[in-house]
């Protein structure tokens, strides 16, 4: 029988808090499967890492009065010790805040920009005059504009699953000081997802590429037409700086997308 080459990972735990039961369950189940593959003689590598960038880490670090770098270092040690205490054996347990990740994020971005798949334009965003900063993602909370659920973040509703712009929140408040934000313009960078819609749409039709349920969901998005994706965040922000830009950072979702590539 031909030996298989396998690269295995689990969902990356976020670096703003402790491991929970769901992380541990997934880790143990995956470890059992990986051990079997190795015993069967397959070339199998088990990787995972802490998800470190973004506003939740910044907020958690601010509460502890330490830097984001100090927080992710402390949490990484805690996560690794907890997971390995359950005899979960990773070939590598790392961090998204790594020099390798920075290198490949910059390389992919520069390639996309060189081939005209990056655009830029000025957008209007929520801005806190008290804290002197823009309020992306979890720096702003309010009422969901889709379902009316209270206390929702600016990057999406945890009740109805809708995505929206932070400035669309109803009765929004800065997550740091609680004040009502205003609006301010800033230049942002966008990845032209629509440039790849035809190629992606054709690729998923192959039954060997994706599960039918995944294909159906993707076709829902394709039927609406892929839109440009905002890949930038204004400083202060904990993440990788965008090459050639001043005080602009890759959003944490962008870095994850580049990792997947």
Language model: regions and residue ranges:
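Structured secondary-structure scaffolds
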Residues: 1-48, 95, 100-104, 147, ...
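A non-catalytic, amphipathic alpha-helix used as a structural packing/dimerization or gating element
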Residues: 32, 70-81, 107
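Residue-level detector of anion-binding/catalytic polar loops
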Residues: 43, 89, 118
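Short, charge-patterned binding micro-sites
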Residues: 50-56
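A charged helix-plus-loop insertion that forms the helical arch/lid used to bind
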Residues: 60-73
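A glycine-rich helix N-cap at a beta->alpha junction
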Residues: 77-91
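Cys/His-rich short segments
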Residues: 116-190
